[in-house]
């Protein structure tokens, strides 16, 4: 019925593509004109396009700025509205420039890298520019397609980001497109973990693989510089973490990202759907890890799993469970049965009358639940691997290891205890965001993938992104065979082995896709027993990933890969000549770095000839054959695996092998129904495969159920995270306003005055009191401004006989005087130090700048400390909110209500922290600055006493000599006395963080020549402060 309806209404996707034909015709008509231009004229075209863009947007932009002139742009809602209107203005101008810009990039690409964009690639570029998702089959050139909208949107001068799934793909993609952009006068940046670079054709990276021109021209630069490039390539993790780090900095110049203007997400389904449930978290150490993790890991061993489900007990089909615990495979949760609970209570030696879930044992249940999950739900070589004594999570969708990622809420510690590796201390969340909310902050977002249409509903509902299927340049001729279905995994793996051998014997390359490390090693061991050479690519070995995948199309090659989704490297029939050059050079007795130009040319020609000969042989044999060892939870990941074969019109085929013992079938399949079908169709031979449309539908139905379940979970995550996301936007917008503000004094004074007004009402104008409590009011006033205690007698006289409102006015006046006096005193002290050649705070060069810096630090410190506490509290609220369902309340509604109440408390806590700390911390700074003065005077006196220059003045002392491989800095503890004092020696490694808290390494900051005196002053301040804290 639906197919008939589709024919009647027409294919909406075809209509979208057809609408782009006039634009495509315009682009093609410009091709002869572009070909006639010289290289220099092509480059000049970029500047011309930028000028035209500025002219096209000028009037509307000025009108927009005028309308928002009186608005608070630091308000996240106002800024969003502004950016929406600005996007309409800019997109209208870019749409007008699109044909010329695309034609320009096409011509530059043809000249620089020898690749001309096909018409279908132009259509893909238009889709991406419009902020949609382009579904493009494997081998259709997504990297090249992205160059078109990246260039066009970079014309606006606000940056354009290309986001990929791993560092290698980002580096290769940027290095391949970099020459195109460079020829057109645009810069390309690259960000990775602890590394950032700019594409520079005149720079050669000595550490890069020299035979790959895409990797050698990355010149290291600051992260800020990489983001300021016209286009920036990087991974989703790096962009997200940089955003979080930017919202934790203490100085504006420490921010690295600019506005989130335009982004293209490669493998968009992987990043925005598969990883949507995994939040990015920056955490810091909390308390030391508890011994209870090891204790409970030992206690939970040896429990028996129940084969009876709660449904069977609830429906009366079974009397009781037959084990100690049962597992809900769908939600991956584990629950103790009554017998299991009794076992655990005995093992814990709980007193009679006590049980695990008594309030006093609440903490123990946390360890118990995590230990049970670690022991029985999370499996080694499936959910994680152990590498170098560490538990490393394996991405369930891509099969990649995720170093640095840790499960939260103690689960990671429980797994570490299970594996008998070091149990690391637990963490507290400092900042967090989900990919869903990070990418929704971009003004415009596009995406590319080979498989998106099955998730079109989710892309539309959560990200407001439409999926458009881009036609292939050549027709796909791959043959997708029906699934082979078996009752047992043993029979299935035997069939997989037979099929691999059959394909190998006729010279066809085979790619075996598995869903876990465990299953990939099962296949690998079967092949070893048969003596068949093969490559194994899983979470344990991905260093040579790109090379292995690139050569997977060679004659008779056998490659086993865990979840091919997102691998990002094309499998070329016959192999990739680039990867064979080193082999031929080795045969010539040389290497890539030592080869002569003649040897290099000979190796390249030989590799190309070998590949071409193999390509013909492989194509005649039938091309690449794909084997899936089981169906994935999502149909699109199956499609991604299939899509590795049959690229750009090449021959190929695919088949999936399934058993009823596969995880998908046990968790989501209706096993009883499928078993009955199989019994009717089989003759009892387990080794005989079954092919049936009914069975195929049953399996597809299981996949549809799991897709629906996972969509609901992700929607659930985003609904909850949206609450915190709005609050995060408010907090981060406030931080940005503070970082960019020159003077926060008025705002701080306003907070102080508000607090005084509260206490006026509480102590002086409170009808519940018998009489005004002036003493109580003064206590609060002195706790806010301790400096006023010195004026106690004078203030008592001024307040005597006054009404509440008059006292409030006098108190406000007195506080403002104290504030101004404090600013003047700190300014005088800071000026004195500057005159003596010491700058206690790097980058703060004047007395006014110092006081403004101090005010900002007070406000940022209050926000950050309270926000960290709030994140912990709101996470605990979220974990426990499910209990309200018992009281028949909607958990989401209850969570929103409580979270908004907590957020109001957070704002009040921030204000209180600023109000009650500001004057106290300022007084401490006065003490610290005076201490630095005394330290300097003591060192000067010491130098004179020790026979220094007779003409010694109050200039800064000579710098201490630097040691080899590090530095020793001596800080006197003389505290103003001229006599020799005990010295404190602080050793700082060249690569250690600089003690000035700039975030830079020591060697690049105060380890530079001429910075010694300044460093001594900083260390003196820190030392004095540490002493002061100790005394408190």
Curated annotation (Swiss-Prot):
- Look up the EC number in the record and give it: 7.4.2.8
Task: Name the Pfam families on file.
Answer: P-loop_SecA, SEC-C, SecA_DEAD, SecA_PP_bind, SecA_SW
Q: Which InterPro entries match?
A: Helicase_ATP-bd (IPR014001), Helicase_C-like (IPR001650), P-loop_NTPase (IPR027417), SEC_C_motif (IPR004027), SecA (IPR000185), SecA_CS (IPR020937), SecA_DEAD (IPR011115), SecA_motor_DEAD (IPR014018)
Tell me the residue numbers annotated for binding ATP: 121, 139-143, 570
Localisation: Cell membrane; Cytoplasm
Q: List the disulfide bonds.
A: none
* Chief localization: membrane
Membrane topology, from the record: Peripheral membrane protein
- Cofactor-binding details, from the entry: May bind 1 zinc ion per subunit.
Named cofactor requirement(s): Zn(2+)
For region Disordered, the annotated ranges are 945-975
What is one process in the GO biological process aspect for this record?
protein targeting
Amino acids binding Zn(2+): 994, 996, 1005-1006
Write out the entry's keywords from A to Z: ATP-binding, Cell membrane, Cytoplasm, Membrane, Metal-binding, Nucleotide-binding, Protein transport, Translocase, Translocation, Transport, Zinc
Q: In the record, what terms sit under GO molecular function?
A: ATP binding; metal ion binding; protein-exporting ATPase activity
- Which reaction equations make up its catalytic activity? ATP + H2O + cellular proteinSide 1 = ADP + phosphate + cellular proteinSide 2
- The keyword Cell membrane belongs to this UniProt entry's keyword annotation: yes
According to its UniProt record, which protein family does this protein belong to? Belongs to the SecA family.
NCBIfam families of this UniProt entry? Answer: PRK12904.1, secA
Its biological purpose: Part of the Sec protein translocase complex. Interacts with the SecYEG preprotein conducting channel. Has a central role in coupling the hydrolysis of ATP to the transfer of proteins into and across the cell membrane, serving as an ATP-driven molecular motor driving the stepwise translocation of polypeptide chains across the membrane.
Q: Subunit structure, per the record? A: Monomer and homodimer. Part of the essential Sec protein translocation apparatus which comprises SecA, SecYEG and auxiliary proteins SecDF. Other proteins may also be involved.
Q: What is this protein called?
A: Protein translocase subunit SecA
């Amino acid at each position: 019925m639906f197919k008939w309806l589709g024919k009647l209404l027409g294919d909406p996707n075809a209509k979208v593509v057809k609408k782009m034909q006039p634009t495509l015709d315009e682009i093609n008509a410009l091709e002869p004109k572009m070909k006639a231009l010289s290289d220099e004229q092509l480059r000049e075209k970029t500047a011309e396009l930028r000028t035209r863009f500025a002219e096209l947007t000028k009037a509307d932009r000025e009108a927009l700025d005028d309308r928002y002139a009186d608005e608070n742009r630091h308000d996240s809602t106002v800024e969003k509205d502004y950016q929406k209107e600005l996007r309409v203005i800019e997109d209208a101008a870019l749409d007008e420039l699109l044909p010329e810009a695309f034609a320009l990039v096409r011509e530059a690409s043809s000249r620089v890298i020898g690749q001309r964009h096909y018409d279908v690639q132009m259509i893909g570029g238009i889709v991406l520019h419009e902020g949609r998702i382009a579904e493009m089959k494997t081998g259709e050139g997504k990297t090249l397609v992205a160059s078109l909208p990246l260039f066009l949107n970079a014309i606006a001068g606000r940056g354009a980001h290309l986001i990929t799934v791993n560092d290698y793909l980002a580096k290769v993609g940027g290095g391949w497109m970099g020459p195109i952009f460079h020829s057109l006068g645009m810069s390309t940046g690259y960000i990775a973990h602890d590394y950032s670079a700019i594409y520079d054709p005149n720079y050669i990276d000595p550490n890069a693989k020299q035979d790959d021109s895409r990797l050698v021209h990355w010149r290291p630069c600051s992260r800020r510089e990489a983001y300021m490039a016209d286009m920036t390539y990087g991974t989703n993790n790096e962009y997200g973490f940089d955003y979080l780090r930017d919202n934790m900095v203490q100085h504006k110049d420490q921010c690295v990202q600019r506005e989130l203007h335009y982004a293209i997400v490669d493998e968009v389904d992987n990043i925005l759907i598969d990883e949507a449930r995994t939040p990015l978290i920056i955490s810091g150490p909390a308390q030391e890890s508890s011994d209870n993790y090891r204790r409970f890991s030992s206690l939970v061993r040896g429990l028996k799993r129940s084969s009876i489900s709660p449904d069977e007990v609830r429906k009366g089909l079974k009397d009781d469970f037959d084990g100690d615990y049962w597992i809900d495979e769908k939600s991956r949760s584990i629950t103790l049965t009554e017998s299991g609970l009794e076992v655990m209570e005995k093992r814990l030696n709980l007193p009679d009358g006590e049980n695990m879930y008594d309030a006093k044992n609440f903490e123990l249940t946390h360890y118990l639940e995590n230990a049970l999950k670690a022991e029985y739900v999370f499996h080694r070589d499936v959910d994680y691997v152990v590498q170098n004594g560490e538990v490393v999570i394996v991405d369930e969708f891509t099969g990649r290891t995720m170093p640095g990622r840790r499960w939260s809420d103690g689960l990671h510690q429980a797994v570490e205890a299970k594996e008998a590796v070091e149990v690391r201390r637990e963490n507290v969340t400092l900042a967090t965001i989900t990919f869903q909310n990070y990418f929704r902050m971009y003004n415009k977002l596009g995406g590319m993938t080979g498989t998106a249409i099955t998730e079109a509903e989710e892309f539309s509902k959560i990200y407001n992104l439409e999926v458009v299927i881009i036609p292939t340049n050549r027709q796909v001729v791959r043959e997708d065979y029906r699934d082979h279905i078996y009752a047992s995994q043993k029979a299935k793996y035997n069939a997989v082995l037979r099929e691999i051998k059959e394909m190998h014997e006729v010279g066809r390359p085979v790619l075996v896709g598995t869903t876990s490390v465990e299953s990939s090693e099962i296949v690998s061991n079967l092949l070893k027993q048969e003596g068949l050479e093969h490559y194994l690519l899983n979470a344990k070995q991905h260093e040579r990933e790109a090379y292995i995948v690139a050569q997977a199309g060679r004659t008779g090659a056998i490659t086993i890969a865990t979840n091919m989704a997102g691998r990002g490297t094309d499998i070329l029939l016959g192999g990739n000549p680039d990867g064979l050059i080193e082999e031929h050079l080795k045969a010539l007795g040389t290497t890539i770095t030592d080869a002569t130009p003649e040897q290099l040319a000979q190796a390249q020609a030989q590799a190309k000839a070998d590949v071409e000969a193999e390509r013909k042989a492989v194509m005649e044999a039938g091309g690449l054959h794909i084997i899936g060892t089981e169906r994935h939870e999502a149909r699109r990941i199956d499609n991604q695996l299939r899509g590795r074969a049959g690229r750009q019109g090449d021959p190929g085929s695919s088949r999936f092998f399934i058993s009823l013992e596969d995880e998908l079938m046990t968790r989501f399949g209706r096993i009883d129904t499928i078993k009955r079908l199989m019994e009717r169709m089989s003759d009892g031979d387990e080794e005989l495969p079954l092919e049936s449309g009914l069975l195929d539908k049953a399996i597809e139905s299981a996949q549809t159920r799991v897709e629906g379940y996972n969509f609901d979970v992700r929607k659930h995550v985003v609904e909850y995270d949206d609450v915190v996301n709005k609050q995060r936007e408010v907090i981060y917008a406030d931080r940005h306003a503070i970082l960019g503000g020159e003077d926060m004094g008025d705002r701080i004074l306003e907070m102080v005055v508000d607090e005084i007004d509260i206490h006026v009402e509480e102590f002086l104008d409170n009808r519940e009191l018998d009489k005004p409590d002036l003493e109580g009011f003064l206590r609060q006033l002195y706790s806010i401004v301790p400096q006023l205690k010195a004026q106690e007698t004078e203030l008592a006289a001024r307040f005597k006989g006054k009404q509440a409102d008059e006292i409030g006015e006098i108190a406000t006046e007195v506080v403002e005087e104290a504030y101004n006096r404090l600013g003047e005193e700190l300014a005088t002290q800071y000026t004195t130090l500057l005159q003596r050649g010491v700058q206690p705070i790097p980058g703060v060069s004047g007395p006014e700048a110092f006081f403004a810096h101090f005010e900002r630090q007070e406000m940022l410190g209050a926000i950050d400390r309270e926000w960290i506490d709030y994140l912990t509290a709101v996470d605990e609220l979220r974990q426990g909110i499910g209990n309200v369902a018992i009281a028949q309340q909607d958990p989401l509604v209850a969570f929103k209500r409580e979270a908004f109440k907590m957020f109001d408390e957070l704002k009040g806590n921030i204000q209180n922290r600023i109000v009650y700390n500001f004057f106290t911390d300022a007084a401490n700074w006065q003490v610290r600055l005076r201490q630095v003065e005394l330290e300097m005077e003591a060192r000067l006196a010491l130098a004179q006493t020790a026979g220094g220059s007779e003409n010694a003045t109050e200039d800064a002392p000579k710098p201490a000599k630097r040691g080899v491989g590090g530095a020793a800095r001596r800080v006197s503890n003389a505290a103003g006395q001229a006599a020799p004092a005990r010295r404190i020696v602080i050793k700082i490694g060249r690569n250690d963080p600089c003690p000035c808290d700039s975030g830079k390494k020591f060697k690049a900051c105060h380890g530079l020549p001429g910075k010694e005196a300044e460093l001594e002053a900083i260390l003196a301040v820190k030392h004095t402060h540490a002493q002061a804290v100790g005394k408190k």
